[in-house]
Amino acid sequence: MACRLFWASRVASHLRISVAQRGFSSVVLKDLKYADSHEWVKIDGNKATFGITDHAQDHLGDVVYVELPDVGHSVSQGKSFGAVESVKATSDINSPVSGKVVEVNEELTESPGLVNSSPYEQGWIIKVELSDAGEAEKLMDSDKYSKFCEEEDAKH
């Protein structure tokens, strides 16, 4: 657990954000927005970077493949644009916001495990140019996402 907290503080420092305190074991970073399908998004002007949350990667297990869209592909909020395959399951990746893909994390082709080891830093999946910045307001902040995960975990 101490190692995870050190990792979280290092990532938060790199992203210039703070770590939310919560009652479950996944790392949730403040200043990011979260979808109920367990994707995170960091908005920077009219650009957004996103990936899957620490909570999602923890439940998936070791990621062995990430299906990435092509640059120029349009993504829509709540719609699938790719998939993450792990030793346990294959899961769709849904877009937390709408936009046009401007960059994909090519490192995931050779090192899909970055999604596990560094979901908020090296394991980001795509960057988009936003088509509707207001969509981010529909997403959860870190406190709501933490509570959502706690409630979801309590059901299982």
UniProtKB/Swiss-Prot annotation:
Entry's Gene Ontology BP terms: glycine decarboxylation via glycine cleavage system
Keywords: Lipoyl, Mitochondrion, Phosphoprotein, Transit peptide
Residues with PTM N6-lipoyllysine: K88
Keyword Ribosomal protein set for record: no
Span of the transit peptide along the chain: 1-23
MF annotations from Gene Ontology: ATP binding
Alphabetical list of Pfam families matching this protein: GCV_H
Positions bearing Phosphoserine: S131
An example Gene Ontology CC term for this record: glycine cleavage complex
Requisite cofactors: (R)-lipoate
Compartments, as annotated in UniProt: Mitochondrion
Cofactor info, note text: Binds 1 lipoyl cofactor covalently.
Ranges for domain Lipoyl-binding: 47-129
Role: The glycine decarboxylase (GDC) or glycine cleavage system catalyzes the degradation of glycine. The H protein shuttles the methylamine group of glycine from the P protein to the T protein.
Similarity-based family: Belongs to the GcvH family.
Subunit-level organization: The glycine cleavage system is composed of four proteins: P, T, L and H.
Protein name (record): Glycine cleavage system H protein 2, mitochondrial
Source organism of this protein record: Arabidopsis thaliana
Record lineage: Eukaryota, Viridiplantae, Streptophyta, Embryophyta, Tracheophyta
